[in-house]
């Protein structure tokens, strides 16, 4: 039985903060693999614009290819409409009944947990791992495991803005992702 961390996100674009967080959780929680799972449409972000899913998946492949413990899980890309974690986890549990799944969430999502769709049922299906982050309240009545990750203030929004304003993104995103963004004209004004 493998212990697998599911790391969902828009990854628009994937950045070194995502990779650092995944690597820290991998080792602190004693997991065998981290599966990066790009969202189709997160319910809490339905009114935002996203880069085409094809490009987000390609960038993610480039970002994780150097770590053999990092895999890509596209279950949410197979479905139309909003991506609810409960539906996704139910499907993954059916597909991988012999593996132990953990769902990784950032400190911002810990605060949002009470609003999650079918949360009580979800907590019976999967163990959550909360990633601590400065400035966010991580106390919760829910049974979460926690991981400490070194502070690395970077966000996909900031990186998109840097590309639009032609500011450097060195050391914020993997070089192969940067090259892909530039070659495909993503995030231009």
UniProtKB/Swiss-Prot annotation:
Protein name as catalogued: Nicotinate-nucleotide adenylyltransferase
Superkingdom assignment: Bacteria
Gene of this entry: nadD
Catalytic activity: nicotinate beta-D-ribonucleotide + ATP + H(+) = deamido-NAD(+) + diphosphate
UniProt keyword list: ATP-binding, NAD, Nucleotide-binding, Nucleotidyltransferase, Pyridine nucleotide biosynthesis, Transferase
Transmembrane segments: none
Function description: Catalyzes the reversible adenylation of nicotinate mononucleotide (NaMN) to nicotinic acid adenine dinucleotide (NaAD).
Enzyme class of the recorded protein, top EC level: transferase
Organism listed in the record: Bacillus subtilis (strain 168)
Subunit and interaction comment: Homodimer.
GO BP, sorted A to Z: NAD biosynthetic process
CDD domains per the UniProt record, alphabetical: NMNAT (cd02165)
Enzyme Commission number: 2.7.7.18
One GO MF term attached to the UniProt entry: nicotinate-nucleotide adenylyltransferase activity
Pathway: Cofactor biosynthesis; NAD(+) biosynthesis; deamido-NAD(+) from nicotinate D-ribonucleotide: step 1/1
Recorded family membership: Belongs to the NadD family.
């Amino acid at each position: 039985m493998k212990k697998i961390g599911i790391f969902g996100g828009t990854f628009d674009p994937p950045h070194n903060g995502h990779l650092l967080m995944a690597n820290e959780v991998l080792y602190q929680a004693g997991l065998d693999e981290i599966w990066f799972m790009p969202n189709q449409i997160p319910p809490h972000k339905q009114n935002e614009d996203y880069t085409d899913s094809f490009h987000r998946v390609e960038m993610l492949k480039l970002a994780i290819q150097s770590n053999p413990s990092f895999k890509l899980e596209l279950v949410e890309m197979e479905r139309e409409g909003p991506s609810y974690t409960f539906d996704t986890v139910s499907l993954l549990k059916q597909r991988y009944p012999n593996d132990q799944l953990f769902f990784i969430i950032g400190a911002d999502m810990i605060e949002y947990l009470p609003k999650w769709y079918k949360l009580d049922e979800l907590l019976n299906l999967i163990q959550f791992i909360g990633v601590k982050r400065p400035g966010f309240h991580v106390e919760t009545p829910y049974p979460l495991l926690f991981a400490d990750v070194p502070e690395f203030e970077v966000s996909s929004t900031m990186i998109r803005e840097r590309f639009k304003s032609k500011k450097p993104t060195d050391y914020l995103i993997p070089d192969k992702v940067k090259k892909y963004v530039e070659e495909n004209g993503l995030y231009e004004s």
